[in-house]
Regions:
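Helix-terminus/linker motif at the lipid-water interface of multi-pass membrane proteins
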Residues: 32, 36-54, 124-135, 191-198, ...
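Generic alpha-helical transmembrane segments of integral inner-membrane proteins
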Residues: 28, 32, 36, 40, ...
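Short runs within selected transmembrane alpha-helices of multi-pass transporters and secretion channels
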Residues: 75, 147-166, 174-185, 203-216, ...
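Small-residue-rich hydrophobic transmembrane alpha-helices
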Residues: 54-114, 155-174, 289-355, 388-407, ...
Length: 480
């Protein structure tokens, strides 16, 4: 059995609670800080540009999520495979995995940047920049997206390397890399928006500057890793190797990609039905579009905590699974799902009690209609978040122990099979039953309905996995 120490922590014997905290907290902070990139932009844009600017960032946001999905597919998959490889004592496979992940991330980042820049107008239209939002919002979206697209390779590299750095036993370095970029973004945002008067373009430039800093710090660390030594042969792409680690991160990609699909569908439905509702000021969907974008930002904050806690434990669960310490994997699973549910309860209370206070962080000079819709959106759309926390955690845990089929299946059910059809069908149903002005409520109900169904299936799969780990533990003890 291999042993791995991180500082003073031995992953096969240190207390599970302490080990979880050691890995999860830096990861949570890293992902929270990453989420702040978009949130800080939107806060400054809300105060310095207005609702049209916030609407523009809402249109662009799914496209950054798509880039994140590709990056996390490579990074989380490599992280899981590296941890399992180190747990079984195969360092050669570990360093080749890291090298392949680096090259693959760079290639994907450049290709995605070119696609975004070449096909910008039709892409933005696909994600909600239609005639039902104002021309000003559409123009802002184009200005913002141009610079965000240029920064995509740096953004993807920083996000993909973050879990790999954690798998090398340096969660604090991963956290510091992300934190440095976010601090730069927070400092540069007001300078670019309020002093240089660059409106939404300034927010995008500040974001890209922060992403470059994160990428540079990641490169510096990769040159002197602790557990892994990279060489020229590490960077030679090997199909058989990528075939093994990419499926382990496919759930991360699928989760983000399906979120992109549901957000694209949501943006278009909000634009259409928002303009028909009592919240559609001036006959446009600008107000509902801006509010839904902000609600999604707070949802992303919660998801950053949830995913951070789960992804931070990938090296711990993966290493112990590879080392046949099934008792520790089972205990980690039990604690993880419990903690995630409690996190969801805390966020639910915040969303239900303080919706107006939350929305006012993004500007306090909007109309009463704007705040009325914010209250409705927070309280309906996010009412099932404790169950969603358990679902998201289940996806990642199953991925970490080399169960991509179950993990991918759950993610597909949540985001593709349920979320996308429901966000399209329910507004039509509500329109037929209650009139065109109430179609917007069908959009808000779609998410909790998808979550409840997915939660039921996730509980069944989790219980089976828990029993399997217990059986494997018994087999291991009988051999010993």
């Amino acid at each position: 059995m291999s042993e791995k120490k991180t500082g003073e922590l031995d992953l096969t014997s240190a207390p599970i609670g302490k080990t979880m905290l050691n890995y999860a907290i830096p990861c949570i902070i890293s992902l929270l800080v990453a989420a702040l990139y978009n949130i800080v932009d939107q806060i400054y844009i809300g105060w310095g540009v207005g609702a049209e600017g916030n609407g523009a960032t809402s249109i662009v946001f799914p496209l950054t999520v798509l880039a994140l999905g590709i990056a996390t597919m490579i990074g989380d998959g490599a992280c899981s495979y590296v941890s399992i490889s180190l747990g079984s004592g195969d360092k050669d496979r570990a360093h080749r995995t890291v090298g392949n992940a680096i090259v693959l991330t760079i290639i994907c980042g450049i290709v995605l940047m070119l696609i975004y820049l070449i096909f910008m107008t039709p892409i933005l239209r696909m994600f909600g920049a239609t005639d039902t939002v104002s021309e000003l919002t559409r123009n802002y979206a184009k200005r913002y997206f141009t610079w965000i697209a240029i920064g995509i390779p740096f953004y993807m590299f920083g996000q993909a390397m973050n879990p790999i750095i954690r798998s090398d036993g340096s969660p604090r370095v991963a956290m510091a890399a992300t934190l440095a970029g976010a601090i730069a973004n927070i400092i540069l945002d007001p300078v670019a928006i309020f002093i240089l008067k660059w409106d939404v373009m300034g927010a995008a430039v500040a974001t890209v500057a922060g992403q470059v800093i994160t990428a540079v710090i990641s490169i510096v660390y990769l040159c002197k890793m602790k557990e892994i030594t990279l060489s020229k042969i590490s960077f030679k792409l090997k199909a058989s190797l990528m075939k093994n680690f990419i499926p382990l991160g496919f759930t991360s990609f699928l989760s983000q990609f399906s979120l992109v699909l549901s957000m694209a569908a949501m943006n278009n439905m909000v634009s259409k039905y928002g303009a028909l509702s009592r919240f559609g000021e001036g006959g446009t969907g600008d107000t509902p579009m801006a509010v839904v974008g902000i609600v999604m930002k707070f949802f992303q904050i919660m998801i950053s905590v949830v995913v951070g806690m789960s992804a931070g434990c990938i090296p711990v669960s993966g290493f112990n699974y590879g080392a046949h310490r099934y008792d520790r994997v089972r205990e980690l699973m039990r604690r993880l799902l419990t903690y995630e549910f409690l996190v969801g309860v805390v966020f639910l209370l915040i969303f239900e009690i303080f919706p107006v206070q939350l929305i006012k962080l993004f500007g306090n000079s909007y109309s009463q209609t704007y705040y009325d819709f914010a209250k409705v959106a927070f309280r309906i759309y996010l009412c099932a978040v404790p169950l969603d926390c358990v679902c998201k955690s289940s996806f990642i845990f199953l991925q970490s122990v080399g169960k991509p089929v179950q993990s991918t299946g759950l993610s597909l059910l949540r985001e593709v099979v349920l979320a996308v059809p429901l966000v399209i069908i329910l507004p039509w149903v509500f329109t037929q039953l209650f009139g065109s002005e109430n179609g917007i409520y069908g959009i808000l109900v779609s998410m909790p309905m998808a979550v409840v169904i997915t939660f039921i299936v996730a509980v069944i799969i989790d219980l089976r996995m828990y029993r399997k780990l217990k059986a494997l533990e018994g087999e291991e003890n009988s051999i010993l």
